């Protein structure tokens, strides 16, 4: 399945299981491509530490043009959370480093230990995914991978500060065999959500 297709499929299934329309073009004023004390509040020191641990260039970060970030989907109503589908490239050594620096007691809708374990297993392959791509604030080989891990933190740290419920994350390893919207796929996702949303 092509990159992005599985994400669309999972979004559709989650929407069906929750009986809630997925908003795939949702924007938030506070969900932009650089960190600030104003947006991160009590988690500012954590995101700043994470940024530094990834060897980010703070001057480049703070002077780059502010751009609204996309989330894979947003589910409103009683759910009020961002949904993210994590493919292999999200399980890098950079992502492992970010999770290790998360504040204690952070509420998330996924198993941090499992994400760390998967990052340990897949980091070599994930680190090599588009390895030569750089960004303005991560201007080195592997920079885009570091930026991806940095921005994943926004999806985990900001909701608590900005009045949303914790981000729902599902990874590709949890949904092996899900290839279409059918009764079996809906049941599998329903069982997964029972674990994640309790």
Protein language model annotation of sequence segments:
Residues 1-198:
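Nucleic-acid endo/exonuclease domains
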């Amino acid at each position: 399945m092509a990159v992005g297709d599985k994400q669309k499929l999972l979004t559709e299934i989650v929407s069906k299981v929750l009986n809630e329309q997925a908003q795939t073009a949702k924007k938030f004023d506070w969900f932009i491509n650089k960190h600030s004390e104003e947006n991160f509040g009590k988690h500012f020191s954590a995101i700043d530490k994470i940024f530094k641990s990834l060897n980010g260039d703070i001057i480049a970060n703070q002077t780059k043009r502010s751009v609204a970030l996309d989330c894979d989907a947003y589910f409103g109503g009683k759910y009020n959370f961002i949904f993210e589908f994590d493919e292999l490239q999200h399980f890098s050594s950079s992502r492992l480093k970010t999770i290790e620096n998360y504040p204690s007691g952070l509420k998330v809708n996924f198993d941090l230990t499992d994400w760390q374990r998967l990052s340990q297993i897949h980091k070599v392959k994930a680190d090599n995914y588009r390895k030569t791509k750089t960004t303005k604030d991560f201007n080195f080989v592997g920079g885009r991978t570091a930026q991806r891990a940095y921005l994943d933190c926004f999806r985990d740290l900001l909701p608590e500060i900005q009045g949303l419920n914790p981000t729902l994350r599902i990874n590709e390893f949890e949904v092996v065999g899900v290839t279409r919207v059918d009764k079996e796929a809906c049941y599998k996702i329903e069982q997964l959500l029972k674990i994640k949303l309790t």
